[in-house]
């Protein structure tokens, strides 16, 4: 794949981790003075007319321009007059010159915009009453502000056949104004060259040329950047208007990135999920699973407590009966006879409440579904299990070594950051593991974990690349640590990171060692002292097992004694609920105010957008009620009190949107030398190799019909490619 030539000079791009469009920093003496409607403003050389206008608060209309995409300059809506210039200019593409006087509201500027708008509306169907973009449409807003009140066009309008690009994005291409935002997003951000234009002039069309699915994990973002109703959401079609919905700022838990989102609800139902700006995490994008899996929140839900009767069937019961049965078991068994497993969607408040409850019965067998090696530094040092460089820090790196991970599907927004740096900053990327399509070129070093030993010893050619780097990153996927030689892999990567710091040009506070997690609850669980993996439970099977949202299938009925009493607390009837003796229905992430910690160690909060269905309750409240019935009441009654307890155990869990600086890398490396384990010859294979593996990874996405349609569409598309029809 060739790198796309982005015209940085026209938009003044810099290599900044905070955003894609930045003006190049220069000394104050190099600033040039321009005037916007007579108002003086000092700007850097290379600043565009549009950026200069925005600096003084003057909004210029635009359709094709987007601050995170390259400049196209083809909609002509941003035309402005430059004093003494013979013609109006495109503000988005024209760099300013010293002394220019930009006239944004002159008669010539107004007439130019009216003319452009008249041509755009000449072929637009004007079907706003049935368009899902109505109420948040740039064409509506700008035609009202900058257009004329009548049209001179009396001929027949152009019509275009709609394209089928998959089960997520609905196309009504007659509405398309050829701004090419979607094409540039696909090529530059998503790294998938599926979209383009065919024809020219009045016959120009945007599409995939041949009918095919838009194969990207970020495809839904073209809905947001489309300025008209040409690209809309298929699952959301004809369901609500934006002014009818209530918007709640929250975060996503479909992966460990912690993307910021807006949950739109109406009448107690989640209608759609949109991205929310956070420059340090997801910028303005979200993954398709984040955006479209919300329909799984209303399917296969646990709405009432259930108990297993004498016939072995689960039947509905009251909260009092269910909690009394569980309380009786907790009173009957103590210590190692009681254990708990936390799943991937559990919040920090529930984790600390469950920890306190089990401590009341003298048990510390608290495990997570995801394995993380405890040998060496293990989870004792926080820097040993975090993405220490941070997500935004990727843009400062000059070399990235990926080990046993496929970030494109395990953490799509992190992968988008890598691609962004590769595209704009000439980042060099290498991979140890199965060859996968990461949307950017990389050096494939092989799939054997023993390559790590060669790099650490300096005998591998890539060792020299790392040595010469000024800001290298080694990113180890948590999926690689699920292997039997996970401790040896972690020790080898830690050794590489330490040797890089000692022998290369790394200076200052730059961190080399990074762990990329896949599930939202893992970092908070490790912060609270949970033991990674369920090996301790397999070795010493308990009499009472508490499954807190554990739907990963890490343990089955066959792994436990026949008389083991299993309690499942969660929000979906997925993998864990069918094996339980008692089911306690909990709340999903859109139904509670809760704390989650992402892979870089940043604590963030979800907010209540809708109420839990039926009799379901927030997880920490269920555990608090259970403790009272069992006669071991936990010392908190409100959410604030629970968070005070969180602060006592791990203060960083309540420092929201803050990252605690990681350290103790040298100590972690010294402890890693104590690991007495050999690397296996088995290849490093991440669990999510293709996009089909991306869509259904947890209880919510597995319950989503939309995600099931995506898997079906990808499967059928792959079969069509493998078995072409013979004419």
Swiss-Prot record:
Its cofactor is [2Fe-2S] cluster; [4Fe-4S] cluster. Its EC number is 7.1.1.2. Gene3D superfamilies: 3.10.20.740, 3.30.200.210, 3.30.70.20, 3.40.50.740. The modification N6-acetyllysine is found at residues 84, 467, 499, 709. SMART domains: NADH-G_4Fe-4S_3 (SM00929). Its main location: mitochondrion. It is found in: Mitochondrion inner membrane. Residues 1-23 form a transit peptide. One of its GO terms (cellular component) is mitochondrial intermembrane space. Pfam families: Fer2_4, Fer4_NDSU1, Fer4_Nqo3, Molybdopterin, NADH-G_4Fe-4S_3, NADH_dhqG_C. It catalyses: a ubiquinone + NADH + 5 H(+)(in) = a ubiquinol + NAD(+) + 4 H(+)(out). GO terms for biological process: mitochondrial electron transport, NADH to ubiquinone; mitochondrial respiratory chain complex I assembly. Core subunit of respiratory chain NADH dehydrogenase (Complex I) which is composed of 45 different subunits. This is the largest subunit of complex I and it is a component of the iron-sulfur (IP) fragment of the enzyme. Complex I associates with ubiquinol-cytochrome reductase complex (Complex III) to form supercomplexes. Interacts with MDM2 and AKAP1. NCBIfam families: NuoG. This is NADH-ubiquinone oxidoreductase 75 kDa subunit, mitochondrial.
């Amino acid at each position: 794949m060739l790198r796309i030539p982005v015209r940085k000079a026209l938009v003044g791009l810099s290599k900044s981790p905070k955003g894609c469009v930045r003006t190049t920093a220069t000394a104050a003496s190099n600033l040039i003075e321009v005037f916007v409607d007579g108002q003086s403003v000092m700007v850097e050389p290379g600043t565009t007319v549009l950026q200069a206008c925005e600096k003084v608060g003057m909004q210029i209309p635009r359709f094709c321009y987007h601050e995170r995409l390259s400049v196209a300059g083809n909609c002509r809506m941003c035309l402005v007059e430059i004093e003494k210039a013979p013609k109006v200019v495109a503000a988005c593409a024209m760099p300013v010159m010293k002394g220019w006087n930009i006239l944004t509201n002159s008669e010539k500027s107004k007439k130019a915009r009216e003319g452009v708008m008249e041509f755009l509306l000449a072929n637009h169907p004007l079907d706003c009453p049935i368009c899902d973009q109505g109420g948040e449409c740039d064409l509506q807003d700008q035609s009202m502000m900058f257009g004329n009140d009548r049209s001179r066009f009396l001929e027949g309008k152009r019509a275009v056949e709609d394209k089928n690009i998959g089960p997520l994005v609905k196309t009504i291409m007659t509405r398309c104004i050829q701004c090419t935002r979607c094409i540039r997003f696909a090529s530059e951000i998503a790294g998938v060259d599926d979209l383009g234009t065919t024809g020219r002039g009045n016959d120009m069309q945007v599409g995939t040329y041949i009918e095919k699915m838009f194969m990207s994990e970020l495809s839904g973002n073209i809905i947001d950047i489309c300025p008209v109703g040409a690209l809309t959401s298929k699952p959301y079609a004809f369901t609500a208007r934006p002014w009818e919905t209530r918007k709640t700022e929250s975060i996503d838990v479909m992966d460990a990135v912690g993307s910021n989102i807006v949950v739109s609800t109406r009448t107690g139902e989640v209608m759609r999920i949109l991205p929310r700006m956070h420059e340090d995490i997801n910028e303005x994008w979200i993954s398709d699973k984040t955006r479209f899996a919300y329909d799984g929140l209303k399917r296969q839900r646990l709405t009432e407590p259930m108990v297993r009767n004498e016939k072995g069937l689960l039947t509905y019961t009251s909260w009092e009966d269910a909690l009394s049965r569980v309380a009786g078991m907790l009173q009957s068994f103590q210590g190692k006879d009681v254990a708990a497993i936390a799943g991937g969607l559990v919040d920090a408040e529930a984790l600390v409440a469950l920890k306190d409850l089990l401590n009341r019965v003298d048990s510390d067998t608290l495990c997570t579904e995801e394995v993380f090696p405890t040998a060496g530094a293990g989870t004792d040092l926080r820097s040993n299990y975090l993405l220490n460089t941070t997500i935004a820090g990727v843009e400062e790196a000059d070399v990235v070594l990926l080990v046993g991970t496929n970030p494109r599907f395990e953490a799509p927004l992190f992968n988008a950051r890598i691609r962004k740096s590769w595209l704009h900053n000439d980042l060099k990327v290498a991979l140890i593991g199965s060859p996968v399509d990461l949307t950017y070129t990389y050096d494939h070093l092989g799939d054997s974990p023993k390559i790590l030993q060669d790099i650490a010893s300096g005998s591998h050619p890539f060792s020299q690349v790392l040595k010469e780097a000024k800001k290298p990153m080694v990113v180890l996927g948590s999926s690689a640590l699920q292997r039997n030689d996970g401790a040896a892999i972690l020790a080898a990567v830690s050794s590489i990171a330490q040797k890089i710091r000692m022998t290369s040009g790394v200076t200052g506070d730059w961190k080399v060692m990074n762990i990329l997690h896949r599930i939202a609850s893992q970092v908070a669980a490790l912060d609270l002292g949970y033991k990674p993996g369920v090996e301790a439970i397999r070795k010493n099977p308990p009499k009472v097992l508490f499954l807190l949202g554990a739907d990963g299938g890490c343990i089955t009925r066959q792994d436990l004694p026949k008389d083991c009493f299993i309690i499942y607390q969660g929000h979906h009837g997925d993998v864990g609920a069918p094996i339980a003796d008692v089911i306690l229905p909990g709340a999903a992430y859109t139904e509670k105010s809760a704390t989650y910690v992402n892979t870089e160690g940043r604590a963030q909060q979800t907010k209540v957008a809708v109420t839990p269905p039926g009799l379901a309750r927030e997880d920490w409240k269920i555990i608090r009620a259970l403790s009272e019935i069992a006669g071991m009441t936990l010392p908190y009654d409100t959410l604030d009190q629970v968070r005070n307890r969180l602060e006592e155990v791990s203060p960083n869990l309540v420092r929201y949107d803050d990252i605690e600086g990681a350290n103790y890398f040298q100590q972690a490396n010294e402890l890693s030398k104590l690991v007495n384990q050999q690397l296996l010859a088995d290849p490093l294979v991440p669990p999510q190799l293709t996009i089909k593996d991306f869509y259904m990874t947890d209880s919510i996405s597995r319950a989503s019909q939309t995600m099931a349609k995506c898997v079906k569409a990808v499967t059928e598309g792959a079969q069509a490619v493998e078995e072409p029809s013979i004419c």
